[in-house]
């Protein structure tokens, strides 16, 4: 194999390693709990990457981020596996 092919292979492997998440969970699971801008009091769940658990929080009803699940089952299915 020529050195050009080896260099190309090394580059592709490096790119693949950079694009592959360290864990299998989506990046949204790393976001902090965010209640949003409104003042509703909606029981919701988020994945806490520090405790590695889905935890309850109160969602305000608008805004926030994607780490916001209606049920603990949905949170587990998405972020715990």
Curated annotation (Swiss-Prot):
Keyword tags: Disulfide bond, Protease inhibitor, Secreted, Serine protease inhibitor, Signal, Toxin
GO annotations of cellular component type: extracellular region
Organ and tissue specificity: Expressed by the venom gland.
Pfam families per UniProt: Kunitz_BPTI
SUPFAM superfamilies, per the entry: BPTI-like (SSF57362)
Superkingdom of origin: Eukaryota
Subcellular localization(s) per the UniProt record: Secreted
Keyword rRNA processing: no
Disulphide bridges: 29-79, 38-62, 54-75
Signal sequence, start to end: 1-24
Start and end residues of each BPTI/Kunitz inhibitor domain: 29-79
Gene Ontology molecular function, alphabetical: serine-type endopeptidase inhibitor activity; toxin activity
Predominant location: secreted
Family label: Belongs to the venom Kunitz-type family.
Physiological role: Snake venom serine protease inhibitor.
General remark: Negative results: does not inhibit vasopressin V2 receptor (V2R/AVPR2).
Protein known as: Protease inhibitor 3
